[in-house]
């Protein structure tokens, strides 16, 4: 999953900091 911490990707909120 690409995004920041607590970033909502589409409808999948996550707490993974993968940039």
UniProtKB/Swiss-Prot annotation:
Main location: secreted
Species for this entry: Lumbricus terrestris (Common earthworm)
GO process annotations (BP): proteolysis
Family according to the record: Belongs to the peptidase S1 family.
UniProt-annotated location(s): Secreted, Extracellular space
Keyword DNA-binding: no
Source organism superkingdom: Eukaryota
Gene Ontology cellular component list: extracellular region
Its EC number(s): 3.4.21.1
Known catalytic reactions: Preferential cleavage: Tyr-|-Xaa, Trp-|-Xaa, Phe-|-Xaa, Leu-|-Xaa
Modes of activity regulation: Inhibited by the chymotrypsin inhibitor LTCI.
GO molecular function: serine-type endopeptidase activity
Peptidase S1 domain: residues covered: 1-19
Name of the featured protein: Chymotrypsin LT_CH 1
Keyword Zinc found: no
Record key words, sorted: Hydrolase, Protease, Secreted, Serine protease
Complex and partners: Monomer.
């Amino acid at each position: 999953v690409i995004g920041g911490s607590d970033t909502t990707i589409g409808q999948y909120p996550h707490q993974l900091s993968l940039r």
